[in-house]
Structures are given as structure tokens and as C-alpha cells.
Amino acid sequence: MSEAVPTSARKSKNAPVAPGPAPVLEIESLDMEARGVGRTMTEDGEPGKVIFVEGALPGERVTYSSYRRKPSYEQATVVDILRPSVMRTQPKCTFFGTCGGCSMQHLDMRAQVAVKQRVLEDNLWHLAKLRAETMFAPIHGPSWGYRYRARLTVRNVAKKGGVLVGFHEKKSSYVADMTSCEVLPPHVSAMLVPLRRLVEGLSIRDRMPQIELAVGSTVTALVLRVLEPINADDEALLRAFADEHKVQFWLQPKGPDTVTPFYPLDVSLDYTLPEFGIRMPFKPTDFTQVNHQINRVLVGRALRLLAPSRDDRVLDLFCGIGNFTLPLARLSREVMGIEGSDTLTTRALANARENGVDGHTTFACRNLFEVTGDDLRALGAFDKFLIDPPREGALAVSKALAEIAQSGAGPLPKRIVYVSCNPSTLARDAGLLVHEAGYRLKGAGVVNMFPNTSHVESIALFERD
């Protein structure tokens, strides 16, 4: 009989493994989260696990340390770079690697765009078995200081000397101890330390979890999420800060509907689309594109691809405050904008009036995630569609178009421009439009809306005979 092994000597599956040499891996590609991807080999020379290595780049030979192990893959961080990639560059930000705001600063900008283009192509092929007839040239813009919208977390952390204001640490709920940010506009980056001092002096320093910022053409708005009312001393501090830093404060005591301007009251946010003579007022909680410079180029490309004429009726789905609707109205007979938010629909109508295009526009509030073929038929015939959905994509719209095509009951637009912030849902919807609704994927390309991050914005053109 074998001798029983004492409980204290038995190996636990969670027991720490004795340290040994870090394994070596050849990195073949990047995934959608900007992690290096490699594959181990078995003793028989067969492909083994897929390893996702944070901080590694394609073409590199690295050692790594795994922090999560699954039967078919592991997640790891890079330990040492034995052979660096020619694409590797020195991150500009001191806090890169700790702060979760960026994930690709170590990758050359041209390579970043190339990686995103490949992510788009791979998604179209693997998820929809599609290849675009043409790959559009990428849309480029500023690499730094471009982020005109951000949500900053506020924490009073005694161990770190007081109040922190910034993005979350990478893969953590902790707030990064950051004193500057290279992707925020310089004047906002320079405000991070003064903001810390401001919050330190408020009576509700422990009851203000978040600051949302929105940068307009002439003013920067800061929305303070306040869980308790501010007192007179707080009000005085906010007014003094606003005067010194030329910002406008808004207060949000509860949900988004409770956001109200505090000080000063005689300024307002807007952005412009000079190519089309459009000025777009907005509130700091309205959805607007993060990168205003790229947005201008994106709107121009979308309209050139859609090619509206004075005879066209155009349907703009997920229209928001009218970012595409109003420029389209300059060039079309009629544009109808549909949005799921009543607040944004109201704002879009007001913007159309302010820009003198309300005679060519109509707006409606509808749940586009539940739209059907009958719903689209009820809107009447449209020559062209522009679709700009959130990350969830436009599945119901795509299914509705497929149903109309297959039933033969109802008109279909001859051209669709689809602007996407998620290549996976774009590929899914493209599969429906091509394989079930009879469209051709004429072209697709990336829009580098979020430099130094792994987010992939793209634009695609569909046509139907």
C-alpha cells in the first residue's frame, strides 16, 4: 500500500509555480486589443496554445509571463524583448503602460493604421466572407491632442496624497496617478493638476466620482457628477477656477437629464464643418465625435461616396444631432434623420433651423434596434442611406433591408454609406446587406479617429443595381 501524502504536501492547482526561465515566443500579429499574438509549439512540433502578450509587437521575439491560463490560450505580459520590431517606437506619454487611456503608443503611427486596416479586412473576411472591391486610403489626422471628449474618474486616495483625476489604470478600477495626458488637448492636459487641487478644496471631494469634459470651438465644458449639493464656498471656488482657466462648469446631481449649466451661463459649445458652412451647437452630454478634425474629413468622404444630388431623398439613420444630416441637406432634395434619443432628435431639429436647412430636413425619434421592413416601407422611398450606428451596429436595419429585398415588396436605396466604430458588427451587417439584400461591397477603409488606441473606426460603401 502506498503511503498517504500529507495534506500540507499535496499540490494545489492554485499554488505558486516555482520560478523558472520565462518562455520565449515569436509574435505573429496584433489582435483587436493591440496585444501581440503568438503560438507555442508542442514537443512534437505541432501548433500549441495561442498566447496574447500585452506590450509585444508583430515580428518581435519576446519572453513573457502568463497571468491567465485557459485550455486553448493564455493571456500574458511581455517580460523582455529579445528582438524588437522596426515598428516599435518610444511612447510619448510618461504614464503609458499604467494608464488605460492608450494602448498603442509603442507602435509607429503608420503601423497603427496598417494594423487597423488589417483588423477591418480580417473581420470582413472571417465573419462575412467578404472582401471589398476597393480598400479606401485611410483617413489620417493629428496623433496627439485630438481627444475633445473624455470621462475622467475622481478619487480621493489618501495613500497617494489626496485627490486623483484621470483615466482608469490599465485593466483596473483604480485611477491612474497622472498629471498630464498627451491625447487630450494641451490646455486640458495642463488642467489636470489644477483640477486635483480644485476638488481637494471642495466640501464634496468624496462625493464627486466623475468629471466629463467636452471641448468646443471656443469653450471647454466640465460636467461635475455631484452626489451631494455644493455649498456657497464650493460655488465660489468653481467660479474662480472657471474664470482662471476659461472653462464652463455644469452640474449633474442624478441622471443625464439632470445636467444643467452652472457658470458661466453666457457661453455655449459648438463645433463646425467649414466645408459645408455648418455650425453645430451641442450640450456636453450629447454624443459628438471625439476627434473634431477627423470628423470633418469623415463627413466630407461620406458625402462624396454617397454622392447626393438635388433630386435625391436621403435617409440618415442614427443621425444624432445632425452631424451628417445637415451637410446632406445642403446637397439633397430632402433628408430624413432618425435617432433613438428624443433629446438628440430635438437638438438636430434646432441645429437644422439655426443653419437654415430645416426646409430640406425632417426628423423622427424611433428605436432603430427594433425596426422592421414594414417600418422602412412606411417611411417611403429613399434613393440613398447613411448609417452611423453605435458599437452594437445596425442589425435590425440590415435585416429589414434584407427582408424587403427578398420579398420584393418595397423600394431599396441604390447606395448605402455605413460609418462604423466596431469592425465586428460592421462585418456582420455587411454580410446581411451583401448575401441577403443583394448589395455589393464597393469599398471600405479605416478612419484613424482614435490614434494610439486600438479602437477601429471605418467607413464602407454598398451599392445595388
Swiss-Prot record:
UniProt lists the family membership as follows:
Belongs to the class I-like SAM-binding methyltransferase superfamily. RNA M5U methyltransferase family. RlmD subfamily.
| CDD domains, per the entry | AdoMet_MTases
- Establish whether keyword Transcription is in the entry: no
Q: Which reaction does it catalyse?
A: uridine(1939) in 23S rRNA + S-adenosyl-L-methionine = 5-methyluridine(1939) in 23S rRNA + S-adenosyl-L-homocysteine + H(+)
- Which protein, by its recorded name, is this? 23S rRNA (uracil(1939)-C(5))-methyltransferase RlmD
- The first-level EC class reads transferase
Q: What gene is it encoded by? A: rlmD
Please give the PROSITE patterns that the UniProt record associates with this protein: SAM_MT_RNA_M5U, TRAM
Q: According to its UniProt record, which residues of this chain constitute the active site?
A: 421
GO MF: 4 iron, 4 sulfur cluster binding; iron ion binding; RNA binding; rRNA (uridine-C5-)-methyltransferase activity
Name the InterPro entries on file.
23S_rRNA_MeTrfase_RlmD, NA-bd_OB-fold, SAM-dependent_MTases_sf, TRAM_dom, U5_MeTrfase_fam
User: Which Gene Ontology terms describe the biological processes this protein takes part in?
Assistant: rRNA base methylation
Q: What is the organism of origin for this protein?
A: Burkholderia cenocepacia (strain HI2424)
Q: What does this protein do?
A: Catalyzes the formation of 5-methyl-uridine at position 1939 (m5U1939) in 23S rRNA.
